[in-house]
């Protein structure tokens, strides 16, 4: 039986976390610098533990104004400090709840920059390894960040997206472009099944791009995306694909 991990961003201030956590196998918990805060983090950790969902840290640039989606030119030392701050905060909450962090997935602009910027990718990988060498790093399948992470002796998790279109080089179509998002639920479900069962995805130019799908990112920031997440789970189970971290 094929297996796949389902992850989503949690503790970002949206009202669907508890419902979403019943569908997921992994939760990317925001660490306060792009959204959420101590209260949201603690609730998310509790819910994740209750639902036996793997916990991941979801650090970002210090950018609450733009939800962490704006690229920032930080020095290496500044980025290290912000990463340590966020990982440390989540670890303290996990320690208090008897839970553990299993992986790290950068958020938003930090995720996108690390996918193609060697300096940023290496700072992230080295900081995570120094914090806890047993943590895994989750990132875009086939990205530079995952290659750098492996060089830095970190285990990795290759992530694919249900609701994003892909460029021919395997990167995501930027959100600034009109065709960035997969708008149809039917198309998104077909894309997920194609990536999980065949290891490939259709790029926007029609070419087939090979992808290593170990985890699927879902979104749960509105009622429709929550219903869509339920449909994805149903389709995976219907196709005998086990959801597990």
Swiss-Prot record:
Catalytic activities: 5-oxo-L-proline + ATP + 2 H2O = L-glutamate + ADP + phosphate + H(+)
Keywords: ATP-binding, Hydrolase, Nucleotide-binding
GO biological process: carbohydrate metabolic process
Record carries keyword rRNA-binding: no
The keyword Nucleotide-binding appears for this protein: yes
Pfam families: LamB_YcsF (PF03746)
Top-tier EC class: hydrolase
Record-linked InterPro entries: Glyco_hydro/deAcase_b/a-brl, LamB/YcsF/PxpA-like
Cleavable signal peptide: none
CDD domains found in the cross-reference section: LamB_YcsF_YbgL_like (cd10800)
EC number, UniProt record: 3.5.2.9
Molecular-function GO term, any one: 5-oxoprolinase (ATP-hydrolyzing) activity
Protein's job: Catalyzes the cleavage of 5-oxoproline to form L-glutamate coupled to the hydrolysis of ATP to ADP and inorganic phosphate.
PANTHER family: 5-OXOPROLINASE SUBUNIT A (PTHR30292:SF0), UNCHARACTERIZED PROTEIN YBGL-RELATED (PTHR30292)
Family, similarity comment: Belongs to the LamB/PxpA family.
Quaternary context: Forms a complex composed of PxpA, PxpB and PxpC.
Entry-linked HAMAP family: PxpA
Protein name (database record): 5-oxoprolinase subunit A
UniProt organism field: Haemophilus influenzae (strain PittEE)
Gene transcribed to yield this protein: pxpA
